[in-house]
Amino acid sequence: LLGEVASCSDRIACRERPGEGLRFSLLRNGEPTGISFRAVPTGHEFSSLLLAVLNADGQGKNFPDRSVCDRVRALNGPIRLTTYVSLTCTNCPDVVQALNAMATLNPGVEHETVDGAIHQAEVAALNVQGVPSVFADGELLHVGRGDFGELLAKLEARYGIDAAGIEAVERRFDVVVLGGGPAGV
């Protein structure tokens, strides 16, 4: 699968090295991106692999607005995230893609996606009951559907932030609706 993905562009390469089990990591210019898979990301997770490659190259389109990206960059690390997925899960890609984007934005965040069907003994040892299940440094952080903001809030609560890394956002409004009538609903 990785060879086929690499054959799509002369800017992508696939190198093999000896190791235990099925695992691959994404590198950019030879440097780790913080994104790895212990899975064959087919099915719903194929888009997660492609977006991770695009995000690592700066071409991704699934990043949130600048203020949210600044919050991700301000997370105190190191943070080691592991997400257990099923390749048939329709909620898993949203969580995987959000956490991969966070790993791209903050070098202190590492995210590994694990196919629970391949690593059943690990799933049983951790008592994973549903997918996606996100573990932060070995402790359960989140289970089930989740969006970028929800996952970021949980990471901020657990690891804290460096407030100096966040710029204050001033919002100006042209119109303010006051009252509880039909226009205020």
Show the residue positions of the predicted features.
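Structural micro-motif
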Residues: 17-35, 120-137
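Extracytoplasmic thiol/disulfide redox context detector
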Residues: 1, 6-14, 45-80, 110, ...
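Local sequence-structure signature of Cys/Sec-based thiol-disulfide redox active-site neighborhoods
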Residues: 1-3, 72-113
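Beta1/beta-strand and adjacent pyrophosphate-binding region of the FAD-binding site
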Residues: 166-183
